[in-house]
Amino acid sequence: MELIIISGRSGSGKSVALRALEDVGYYCVDNLPLPLIPELAGFLSNSGRSAVVSLDIRNIPENPESIEALLEQLSKLTIQTKIIFLDCERNTLIRRYSDTRRLHPLSNKDLSLESAIDLENTLLEPLYQQANYIIDTTNISSHELAENLRGILRGSTDKALKIVFESFGFKYGLPADADYVFDVRFLPNPHWNPELRPMTGLEQPVIDFLERQTEVHNFIYQTRNYLEMWLPMLEKNNRSYLTIAIGCTGGKHRSVFIAEQLAKYFQSRDKDVQIRHRSLEKHHKKIS
């Protein structure tokens, strides 16, 4: 369990950082008032949870001693605390504010953008000096920032990409959440066997029928090879889920069997796998 404090200049990417850490399992709180942070840390210590708190110029007092007192108070707790500071070059911050046309948080002090950035830099100096990690976001994308954060905290939590295999029937429409869709309607169809028609791809007679088909074996082999080739790149792309949809006409036989086979294969490779049969779920709801 640990408390991660994200701070840094306005416009340096703190919102991106919070979303990235939320995706890897942290409980995230944006702009928690400074006096409440020790209370949150105490709660986390008792509950065994980890959390991320963002501190920016809106909830940081102008007195540097307040920040030092907070850090000293946190050091007395059993929970581990880390500070990640996001920095960025002044000219890049000016350009980002110009592009988004947003107001700097200190603009309400009747300061120009440049003066607001400089004042903020002074006020954040105590956190900058105490930071465990400093990330310069001047020349990196939001995906690269997220990957840097994941790399820093990998020893604490490394949430694997969850691969969802789902079968569906084309006659019910394409699943909206699919990243990849594979059409297996060209494969031999158990539907035309009167004995197999009322069954599903989860039942042994249908499994036996499909396992005898060379085309089915070839499709499974080539599909899993394709996925294995690109999975490393997908895992590095800051994803939480990868949804792979397998579709046949009714979503009852071929797609169910193939989704099951692919799921079992990737489970055997220690991947985090979930399986879902959309059309079977619809059919079950109609019956019940």
From Swiss-Prot:
Gene3D superfamilies, A to Z: P-loop containing nucleotide triphosphate hydrolases
Chain residues that bind GTP: 56-59
InterPro entries associated with the record: P-loop_NTPase, RapZ-like, RapZ-like_N, RapZ_C
Keyword annotations of the record: ATP-binding, GTP-binding, Nucleotide-binding
Residue sites binding ATP per the record: 8-15
Single annotated GO MF: ATP binding
Role: Displays ATPase and GTPase activities.
Family listed: Belongs to the RapZ-like family.
PANTHER family listed in its UniProt record: RNASE ADAPTER PROTEIN RAPZ
Record-linked HAMAP family: RapZ_like
Protein's UniProt name: Nucleotide-binding protein APP7_0339
